């Protein structure tokens, strides 16, 4: 008499069609992005300070306005970037077609190039594409999406509005002694913030997968 079959459980990495390397890369990328978001949230200043009406005044000169922008960005940079990110998200949500194109482009880069195992060539319609051909197709697709559709103009116009808003707020908000000395040693600049947080977080996960694609 045959023994009864016992129920078995399957871990997520053992699901049919699941790629452990892909799942691991996605987990690393997601964890680093979440860590970056938490770090940015921890760096954010109280929003009441950002909109304190008593701290606003007209700058007496252009040099003073420039100095205010630099100091305010150094202090409120996490708040500013959060607001610009929200503005970008809202702009994309109000343009579903642009959001679909941008999401499809990002997914193509992730799943067809960065997270695709190096020993599994891309096959479409029975044709095998090399890494160089795949990279060329993705680059061409990026150019088409960014410069021949509404995605590029939408992103650039939204960023321009966000940066203009940051500049106006920074120029008219008089810096307070509370944070002048505290932030004097911190280098100002949008690229420095992204390089130390978001770029390092996403690049670390993507670079690990991309380096595995280099064939001897």
UniProtKB/Swiss-Prot annotation:
Keyword rRNA-binding: no
Gene that this polypeptide is encoded by: PRA1B6
Descriptive protein name: PRA1 family protein B6
Tissue expression remark: Expressed in hypocotyls, roots, lateral roots, lateral root caps, columella cells, leaves and stomata.
Highest taxon, organism lineage: Eukaryota
Keyword set, alphabetical order: Acetylation, Endoplasmic reticulum, Membrane, Transmembrane, Transmembrane helix, Transport
Species for this entry: Arabidopsis thaliana (Mouse-ear cress)
InterPro entries linked: Prenylated_rab_accept_PRA1
Highest classification ranks of the organism: Eukaryota, Viridiplantae, Streptophyta, Embryophyta, Tracheophyta
One Gene Ontology cellular component annotation held by this UniProt entry: endoplasmic reticulum
GO biological process, one term: vesicle-mediated transport
Modified positions (N-acetylalanine) in chain numbering: 2
Family named by the database record: Belongs to the PRA1 family.
């Amino acid at each position: 008499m045959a023994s009864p079959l016992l129920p078995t459980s399957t871990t997520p990495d053992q699901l049919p069609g699941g790629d452990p390397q892909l799942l691991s890369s996605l987990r690393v990328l997601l964890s680093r992005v979440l860590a970056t978001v938490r770090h940015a949230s921890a760096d954010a200043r109280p929003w009441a300070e950002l909109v304190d009406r008593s701290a606003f005044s007209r700058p007496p000169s252009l040099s003073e306005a420039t100095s205010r922008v630099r100091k305010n960005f150094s202090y409120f940079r996490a708040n500013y970037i959060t607001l610009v990110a929200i503005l970008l998200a809202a702009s994309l949500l109000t343009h579903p077609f642009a959001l679909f194109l941008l999401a499809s482009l990002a997914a193509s880069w992730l799943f067809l190039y960065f997270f695709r195992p190096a020993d599994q060539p891309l096959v479409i319609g029975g044709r095998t594409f090399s890494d160089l051909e795949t990279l060329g197709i993705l680059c061409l697709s990026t150019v088409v999406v960014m410069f021949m559709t509404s995605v590029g103009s939408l992103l650039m116009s939204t960023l321009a509005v966000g940066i203009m808003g940051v500049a106006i707020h920074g120029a008219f908000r008089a810096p307070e002694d509370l944070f002048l000395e505290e932030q004097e040693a911190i280098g100002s600049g949008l690229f420095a913030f992204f390089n130390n947080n978001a770029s390092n977080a996403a690049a670390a996960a993507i670079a690990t997968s991309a380096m595995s694609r280099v064939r001897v």
